[in-house]
Amino acid sequence: MTVPTPYEDLLRKIAEEGSHKDDRTGTGTTSLFGQQIRFDLNEGFPLLTTKKVHFHSVVGELLWFLQGDSNVKWLQDNNIRIWNEWADEDGELGPVYGVQWRSWPTPDGRHIDQISGALETLRNNPDSRRNIVSAWNVSELENMALPPCHLLFQLYVADGKLSCQLYQRSADMFLGVPFNIASYALLTHMFAQQAGLEVGEFIWTGGDCHIYDNHKEQVAEQLSREARPYPTLELNKAASMFEYSFDDITVSGYDPHPLIRGKVAV
């Protein structure tokens, strides 16, 4: 059976056709602009198999976002350390993703829960072309430990199926993007389940899609591996969008190649 490899195909394209660029971290990158990958969520859950992706961290970070949290303590308590490099001495990150998703501040002092609003729109006006959630709050960027990389997603319903498109302005193709793909695919399943819909596609759209210079060997190793079938997501329905737990979210049939380590560019 031929296994689709849209992520690996883009990774190879960037490695072969990308331009060399300097970057904020001083590491250097090979980069292409304006790329897209599509995943049919009915053909398996897109957790990459050409290297192991730490699914526990994917789940934990998404649950943390959905709680509107901005402190890494809950993540650390659950053995997730992916945000440690950016936290201050008190564990704070400022008004990052979850805060904007759940509590976007308005000029008149109110706060908007974008996730609840998106779910309400799916239930009551599924054909809306305005069902967008944004983490890119220009007025608060300077207070964030790291401005959002995956900054906006749009939900779309057709024929009873929910699709999601993400826009990611800055895409670390080796370390970050495999994680982001799994996270937003999971979020799409959760929205669909809570709204009584089936899943359709997850579409990942990237702006600056780059491979860091210190990841070139790891990318070559990953691209030498043969992809295996995606696993199956098993999602127990929670009472609400905000009451999912680790126990509700598992994958079966995940048989990846071994982990490939790489240094995060901070």
UniProtKB/Swiss-Prot annotation:
EC number(s) reported in the record: 2.1.1.45
Reactions this protein catalyses: dUMP + (6R)-5,10-methylene-5,6,7,8-tetrahydrofolate = 7,8-dihydrofolate + dTMP
GO molecular function, one term: thymidylate synthase activity
Chain residues that bind dUMP: R24, R129, R130, R169, S170, A171, D172, N180, H210, I211, Y212
UniProt-annotated catalytic positions: C149
Keywords, in A-Z order: Cytoplasm, Methyltransferase, Nucleotide biosynthesis, Transferase
GO biological process: dTMP biosynthetic process; dTTP biosynthetic process; methylation
Sites where the protein binds (6R)-5,10-methylene-5,6,7,8-tetrahydrofolate: H54, D172, A265
InterPro entries listed in its UniProt record: Thymidate_synth/dCMP_Mease, Thymidate_synth/dCMP_Mease_dom, Thymidate_synth/dCMP_Mease_sf, Thymidylate_synthase, Thymidylate_synthase_AS
Compartments, record wording: Cytoplasm
GO terms for cellular component: cytosol
Record text on subunit structure and interactions: Homodimer.
Entry's family note: Belongs to the thymidylate synthase family. Bacterial-type ThyA subfamily.
Stored NCBIfam families: PRK01827.1-3, PRK01827.1-5, thym_sym
Function: Catalyzes the reductive methylation of 2'-deoxyuridine-5'-monophosphate (dUMP) to 2'-deoxythymidine-5'-monophosphate (dTMP) while utilizing 5,10-methylenetetrahydrofolate (mTHF) as the methyl donor and reductant in the reaction, yielding dihydrofolate (DHF) as a by-product. This enzymatic reaction provides an intracellular de novo source of dTMP, an essential precursor for DNA biosynthesis.
The protein, known as: Thymidylate synthase
Lineage: Bacteria, Bacillati, Actinomycetota, Actinomycetes, Mycobacteriales
